[in-house]
Amino acid sequence: MSKATKAAATETVMSRIAARASKDSGNNIQRLGDRPLEAVEVTSTGSLSLDAGLGVGGWPRGRIVELYGQEATGKTTLVLHSIIAAQKAGLGVAFIDAEHALDTKYARHLGVNVDDLYVAQPMTAEEALDLVCNLCDSSLIERREIEARAKDEKTAPDFTGMLGLIILDSVAALVPKAELEGEMGDAHVALVARMMGKAMRKMTPSAHHANVTIICINQQRMKINAGHGSPWTT
């Protein structure tokens, strides 16, 4: 079979698959060369040097970012500056305060518009992760409604004020319901890790399609009996 014949056969197969799939669904397939090249949208970190260091100019939109470091190294302060930048860009911001330690006075002093900041202080890991997933899903629904109205009115969609940044502070502070309701001596092996894995699988496509950046703050800890490699883990 010649190269041209193979290419034609592949095109036929792909056309059949595309015919059965909706253009807006995730199972639609098309050749990358047929799609317009899209630059990665970003939200500034609030730090010019970090924006430059990241290579794309800030936090990428529609992605999940882990911001980790040792205790008291300025992670939350960096995130507050990112919130300021997002608000100046006309984006809505949600702060999931699992540590129950958000200093509103300090945030206002830095320049955060705390009046327009959405804040939640969930008690359990399940509540926190469900909230992040629900925020992404709701934002995706709203985004599609705006796009549909703009298409009907033949105008450009206006996403000003829509949720664009979600902060989870922090992964290390998430407490599973079973641990919260259990006894001090009960063993709960890798509960948060399993929940985070499941949540990531749910949040990743929703965050991408809703164009929402999720920043998960995490603590850096020493590995126990680390024989080789980095002694740190998150």
What positions do the PLM features span?
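Phosphate-binding/switch region of NTP-binding enzymes
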Residues: 157, 189-234
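Loop/turn-to-beta-strand initiation segments
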Residues: 90-93, 161-165, 209-215
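Intrinsically disordered, low-complexity acidic Ser/Thr-rich regulatory segments
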Residues: 151-162
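Conserved nucleotide-binding/hydrolysis micro-motifs of P-loop NTPases
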Residues: 99-103, 123-126, 171-175, 197, ...
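Flexible beta-alpha connector loops of hexameric P-loop NTPases
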Residues: 2, 68, 115-126, 179-195, ...
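The Walker A/P-loop phosphate-binding site
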Residues: 3-117, 128-145, 149-151
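General beta-strand structural signal in soluble alpha/beta enzymes
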Residues: 95-97, 119, 168, 216-217
